[in-house]
């Protein structure tokens, strides 16, 4: 999480970053670069139970819950997908379950991802979001039982 920023503020930063990129080749290069900056997930987390179902590529997603905030770590075996999940981690990690559940994630449309991604990759992106929100729902349920 970008310290003390709302989900919407981080989304706006990403939209601003993409606004400087003129072509889709440049945008894809930037997405690849974002993926390269995402720390590699430790091998012990790269197991079947941490894979995101519905992605053509292999995506591993793990979550932790500390001090009322959900933190995500992720990785992928392809550079574009790793870049996509890195943006989601950047936007959603470090927020409360309610903030994650309620997040509209408008940046995905605003930077053109829904119209420029192949259908399979777009489906994978939706699956990643669904998994991240499912973790948040689970942690919210835990809050109520504690």
Please place each PLM-identified region on the residue numbering.
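Alpha-helical support elements that line or immediately flank enzyme active sites
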Residues: 84-95
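A short interface-forming secondary-structure element
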Residues: 76-78
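Hydrophobic (often cysteine-bearing) scaffold residues that line and stabilize catalytic clefts
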Residues: 81
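Glycine-rich phosphate/pyrophosphate-binding loops
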Residues: 94-111
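N-terminal intrinsically disordered, cationic/polar leader segments
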Residues: 4-14, 20-58, 65-66, 70, ...
């Amino acid at each position: 999480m970008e310290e003390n920023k709302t989900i919407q503020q981080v989304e706006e930063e990403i939209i601003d970053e993409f606004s400087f990129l003129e072509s889709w080749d440049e945008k894809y290069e930037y997405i690849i670069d974002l993926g390269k900056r995402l720390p590699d997930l430790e091998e012990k987390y790269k197991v079947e139970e941490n894979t995101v179902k519905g992605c053509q590529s292999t995506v591993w997603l793990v979550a932790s819950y500390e001090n009322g905030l959900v933190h995500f770590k992720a990785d992928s075996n392809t550079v574009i997908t790793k870049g996509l999940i890195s943006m989601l981690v950047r936007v959603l990690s470090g927020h409360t379950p309610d903030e994650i559940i309620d997040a509209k994630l408008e940046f995905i449309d605003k930077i053109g991802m829904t119209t420029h991604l192949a259908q399979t990759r777009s489906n994978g992106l939706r699956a990643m979001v669904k998994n991240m929100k499912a973790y948040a729902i689970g942690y919210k349920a835990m809050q109520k039982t504690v």
